[in-house]
Amino acid sequence: MSQIPKELEKVIELTREQNRWRRTEVINLIASENVMSPLAETVYMSDFMSRYAEGKPYKRYYQGTKYVDEVETLAMQLMNEITNTKFCDLRATSGTIANAAVFRVLANPGEKALIAPVQAGAHVSHTKFGTLGALGIEHIELPYDADKMNVDVDKAIKMIEQIKPKFIVMGGSLYLFPHPVKELAPHAHAVGAKVVYDAAHVYGLITGKAWHNPLEEGADIMTSSTHKTFPGPQGGAVFSNEEEIFKKVADTIFPWFVSNHHLHRLPATAVTALEMKYFGEDYAKQITKNAKAFAEALAAEGFKVIGEHLGYTQSHQVVLDVRNLGGGAKIAKLFEDANIITNKNLLPYDPPSAVKDPSGIRLGVQEMTRFGMKEEEMREIAKLMREVAIDGKDPNEVKKKVIEFRKNYLEVKYTFSVDLSKYSNGKMLPLLI
């Protein structure tokens, strides 16, 4: 063709604009996102993305998988090492798919599961509106302690003993404080129930020793995604120290929920696991320090920050109640207009019907921490947010400040210093910026 189609030009331009905007010009505070290192991105862009490898390493249904087998095995070994586990499966293509495989193994349709209450942050996949519901498993919420913003342990123990569920689920997506795994696991096991922990949001904190390891506190199996506080490619993972239950889940991931498992994730996951092996503790420690400093700064700037009486947060997340400022939908849009990216979120006291315009804003500091920001930068961000939401300044004027602010934080930290050109063979595919 002598002319490039206009649609092709459009696709390239949209990609370029996305990379420029989200990678270099915004303060990204989405709690479920992160950024890979250039090293991980380099191995992510590979021939693996075009290939299939159904089954397990060295037991495939396709030929041509010898390098897939090696890199997948290495990635699982590294993930087990940093998680202090015996068994890992990386074939789930998301945390929700990992949950689906685990739930399918542990209960049949019509049987009961107890989940952490929605007010305490249960993910939609734990509920009747998500994966549990799709599998026909009856979900019952554990009692909620509003003062502690967590599961009510005493009432939960009684419920476990009374209902005798097939399994209980802890972990969540609005997740400021650890759920009581150690306190509830013995009572679950006493009635024959398994304990599932969804670590999607806090997996990087677990591997960085800034959060409790649920498998060391009584959880039987742990699911996760690989792209939140663990800054790898989007994907899922399953971990356990119990061979019998793990084997059943692994045999369910394929062929029940995954055929090909997006092989280009594997080398990038391995690279990220190595980064977290060597730099993860410093990274996780800084995340939690930043979250605490951010919460305190936001409160000082006049925001209503959830959980003040509990120290605001122990995770990467900070949560605002913005009802007095117009509600979550309005404030999230104002922040976006100023290049501060957040998400509106239901708060513990919101009814489910408020999902389109909830009371809250959920924030996460993990990506900005990866770009080298520390406590002082958190205080600067809090001031910018005040200008938009409380002072009522023009978001376009604040946006100029945000873009200028980000110019000093474009390099990914907590990674290896590597000359990528040595490994590219002239075929590296850089980001279009």
UniProtKB/Swiss-Prot annotation:
One annotated Gene Ontology cellular component of this protein: cytoplasm
Pathway membership, UniProt: Amino-acid biosynthesis; glycine biosynthesis; glycine from L-serine: step 1/1
Binding site for (6S)-5,6,7,8-tetrahydrofolate: A122, H123, V124, E244
Keyword Transferase listed: yes
Residues the record marks as site: Plays an important role in substrate specificity: H227
Alphabetized PROSITE patterns for the sequence: SHMT
Main location: cytoplasm
Ligase in keyword set: no
Cofactor(s) needed for function: pyridoxal 5'-phosphate
EC number of this enzyme: 2.1.2.-
GO BP, sorted A to Z: glycine biosynthetic process from serine; tetrahydrofolate interconversion
SUPFAM superfamilies found in the cross-reference section: PLP-dependent transferases
Localisation: Cytoplasm
GO molecular function terms attached to this record: glycine hydroxymethyltransferase activity; pyridoxal phosphate binding
Residues with PTM N6-(pyridoxal phosphate)lysine: K228
Keywords from the UniProt entry: Amino-acid biosynthesis, Cytoplasm, One-carbon metabolism, Pyridoxal phosphate, Transferase
Taxonomic superkingdom: Archaea
Its job: Catalyzes the reversible interconversion of serine and glycine with a modified folate serving as the one-carbon carrier. Also exhibits a pteridine-independent aldolase activity toward beta-hydroxyamino acids, producing glycine and aldehydes, via a retro-aldol mechanism.
Family, as annotated: Belongs to the SHMT family.
Subunit structure of this chain's protein: Homodimer.
Protein name per UniProt: Serine hydroxymethyltransferase
Organism for this UniProt entry: Sulfurisphaera tokodaii (strain DSM 16993 / JCM 10545 / NBRC 100140 / 7) (Sulfolobus tokodaii)
